Amino acid sequence: PLVANATEYPYTLYRGEALGMRAFMHFDLVRLFAAQYTVNPAAGGIPYATEFSLKTPEFESLAKNYEHIVADLLEAEALLADEEDYAGSGNFMLDRQIHFNLHAVRATLARVYLTMGNSEMAALYAQKVISEGNFSLKEKTGVVNDLAGVLSRKETIFGIYFPGFYTNVS
């Protein structure tokens, strides 16, 4: 199987992570390859893939792109709301900061709302991450480890695990 112990956790956990990651990736693409939302939401956006297909989806407006992004993130937030309750015995639930977890969803919502010019919602979601996330800033002396490629568990909301990232540079 693709995921060991896939039936040990509810479908909502996997779907929540997948929706959050889909929104995160589309958000990065739209920021890189489309106009600025606050300047012209009606401007051309990117194709937003909501299902697997060999055909490229139609290009949409920025407003429609952001509508999809926010909808995916809000659904992911609802699906991941109980993620702390899933202790499980498998490796899947270890190191939640390398999964697209509830805090990653909320941090991304804060970024999306800020990019859309909605400071009130951006502040609301940023505050949720700060107050519920148990994150703290690292001391100055610990920053050296970050430069050496060591993950800061205190400050990491989300990251993608890539074994050998720093040793496979050529």
Spell out what each predicted region is.
Residues 1-20, 27-170:
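Structured, solvent-exposed acidic/aromatic patches
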